């Protein structure tokens, strides 16, 4: 986690120790990652990012994981932006692009979050995961777990 300052619960503000397993939180609360933006600005530039792999993991320095080599990946991310010309005209816009997240492994944008979350959980040694979902997230997390 090169640029992570800390992880804390959004509502309570309780900080989670680096490398620690994230304990359960109160309903409606969730862990939030805070970055060292000054160091990030001085170290990372657009060119460095473009040299990464053609996937979500090109942004690894910005993700809350220890090592990109630990990535649990099925090729998520790097989905195309497609022109939606007729809708653009109907909306009075010169150009309109739509992100085609259906090209992700499970057909949903949720693969991005599942890949990062499962990667971090594996880094922490978490071997059992319970995820409550009645939709796309369940399929995505099942693929990555």
Name every feature range the model reports, one short phrase each:
Residues 1-145:
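PLP-dependent amino-acid enzyme catalytic core
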